[in-house]
Amino acid sequence: SVRVQFVMPNTPAMVYEGVMLFEAQNSLEEEERIQIKELFAAVGIVEELPSNLMGIGGAVTGCGPAFVDLFIEGYADAAVKYGVPRQTAYRLISQMILGSAKLQLETGEHPGVLKDNVCSPAGTTICGVASLEESGLRSACIKSIDAIMNK
């Protein structure tokens, strides 16, 4: 009579902003499923996935915080290079990421639309976007997940 539910949290759960992947296939009764989801919802969102997607879900949400931290560190290094104190750079960049993510979540807009809203013709932002594209940012994101999935 042991019941099993696989739940995969990520580190942002420590500040109540986590992602809890909840495997759809389980041995729980419906009432137990609801109670466990409510329990984990206290530390973030609960997303139910079929068993065959738990691996990729974990790769994206479980490993992703390290990649975001690397992104923060890289942009902070650039800010420091141009004179911004490191702690200020971390705070500014982290808040920018938090705000951008919240904007996408609350509006439901496609990330490309939100990006385009910031890019003026011949402006600084589109020049930075072009540089990131030339450097293979999207490809690097995909390859990082490929490396995890092929481990």
For each predicted feature, which ranges?
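Rossmann-fold dehydrogenase core element
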Residues: 1-11
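Residues at secondary-structure transition points
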Residues: 2, 27, 62, 66, ...
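Internal alpha-helical scaffold of NAD(P)-dependent oxidoreductase catalytic cores
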Residues: 2-3, 19-57, 68-106, 149
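Short pre-catalytic strand/loop immediately N-terminal to key active-site residues, enriched for Gly-Thr
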Residues: 4, 54-59, 111-116
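Short beta-strand segments
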Residues: 6-8, 23, 119
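NAD(P)-dependent Rossmann-like dehydrogenase/reductase catalytic/cofactor-binding core
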Residues: 94-151
